[in-house]
Amino acid sequence: YSDYVESAAVLREKLSGFKPDVLIILGSGLGSLGENVQNPIFIDYGEIPRMRTSTAIGHKGRFIAGLLGGKRVLLMQGRLHIYEGWSAEEVVFPVRLAKLIGIDKMIITNAAGGINRDFKVGELMLISDFIKFNCVNPLAGRNIDEFGPRFPDMSRVFDRDYMDLFRSVCADSRENVREGVYFYCMGPNYETPAEIRAMRTLGADAVGMSTVPECIAARHCGMRILGITLITNMAAGILDKPLSGEEVIEAGNAASKRFVSHVAEFLRRMPLD
């Protein structure tokens, strides 16, 4: 715990008195949200002790602090993935730092493959729940009691009030936002068609390689969470073509204007209490 406290002190110092209320983690191809932050403070991950840096395509590896939608935000332009070789604890390190500097709200986004055949590329999906079957867990090992209990409840990971608010934001723009279950795979390989069929049978609507470790850590320390998925491709076996990281980035870029607008408006309407 002392390592977290020490790193949080450095982050607080770099923020020069600025006190964010909301942590925003950006997914593949969605980093352009950072360009809309007012009075930005840029902090490279490498400036924070014990903080790892992102190596994934489309992830810059820095914090941006400032105003977005009238709220004080700390934005992660580039997230960490376990497939990059980081441990689960290293992946959630920034979430715990955010908690220690006083943040108790998180908007987490990702690019994912659509499993639900009704979904279309470019649509947004509110994450209502997740499925995680692999054994990688950021809470494994000795519990850090200062963050939360040994056995945290996961029956309501994603905040229903936040979901309703984001849905109303999209409705005002006449955009239909989907809702569904996110299946977490570690990656970096894409899933096989057989795996996708199994996931669909289990009730999953989208699949991706991020988000779940951070959400587990955030709920462990009592954060309220809004999870947003951008469907950037259809999962393996649905369309007769191979999957690539480039199409994920392209779909993210194509949807970025709508995405930025919706998140900014959500922040404008979001109560801070």
Predicted feature locations:
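Metabolite-binding pocket within alpha/beta catalytic cores that recognizes anionic/polar moieties
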Residues: 1-154
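Non-catalytic positions within long, well-ordered alpha-helices that form the structural scaffold/packing
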Residues: 98-102, 200, 219
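Short acidic/polar active-site loop segments enriched in Thr and Asp
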Residues: 104, 205, 224
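Polyanion-binding loop/helix "lid" in catalytic or ligand-binding cores
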Residues: 147-158, 184, 196, 252-264
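Active-site/ligand-binding-proximal alpha/beta "capping" segment
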Residues: 163, 169-205, 270-271
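Zn-dependent metallopeptidase/amidohydrolase metal-coordination segment
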Residues: 209-247
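His/Asp/Glu-rich mid-to-C-terminal helical/loop segments that flank catalytic regions of hydrolases
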Residues: 236-273
